Amino acid sequence: IVDEATQILEPQLLGILCARGEDGKDAIDKFVLIGDHKQLPAVVQQNTEQSAIYDESLLSIGLTNLKDSLFERLYRNCTATVQRILSSSEQSSPLEQSYSSFAAHRSYDMLCRQGRMHPEVALFANRAFYGGRLIPVGLPHQIESSDTICRLAFYPSVPEKAGTSAKINYSEARIVADLAVRIYEDHQADFDESRTLGIITPYRSQIALIKKEIESLGIPALNRILVDTVERFQGSERDVIIYSFCVNYPYQLKFLSNLTEEEGVLIDRKLNVALTRARKQMFITGVSELLERNPLYKSLLKLIES
């Protein structure tokens, strides 16, 4: 069983999956890959063109790019098989079609029950990226009333003036620090720097600026919270997440996204990771006029506003 399988490149798995015993037979009878191809893949230094595959024998088995995981390749192959079966229904008997479709679908499945996010926190990602299929387990923090708790909020910032680094935003750093204080005061003795609060932002310069703003508050516990990029946050969770977009110019919107497409639906894997780290509350700050140029971000802001 391989967990986080979408973070592992194919060559890193071949050694174990292709292992032979002393008798020369396959040592691995069956393997199960668990992962989420709608979140960030493994980090690869080469660009898509450099890692592309051109060998016909490899292309024939769905191996199109070395930056893709075995999980992604097998999933694509399975879904493509299902589509071929459905499109060729006129050429096969109902029994043949039913059996083939069943066999193809049985090759993969989706774990739909999630125990991390409160349903209101999960709402956008669930609708936009998972077709509304995510179901809360019903843990205490997922069923508690929202009457006195703000689950999802957006705090508008202003872009930095020309001449300032594009990778910092002072107004967002101040908003983040102010929110951090309020969250700390709300939790008091229950505040746990490794569990209560995390801050996500795309640039190292903005990370440093946010840390500086927080240090000026003179609250030791806040100095120990994790402030990092979305890539470093994948796989972790906090009760409350603050996301500073730090977009000062339109061209930065492209850097913020990691796009893929499935069944005609555009999926931003980077945004998906950022929005699914919070258990109880998710706070976002950014320049709304710029963010609304991206259709997904615009939909997110519209949901929050409603």
Regions found by a protein language model. Give the residues of each.
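Conserved helicase motor core of SF1/SF2 NTP-dependent helicases
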Residues: I1-S306
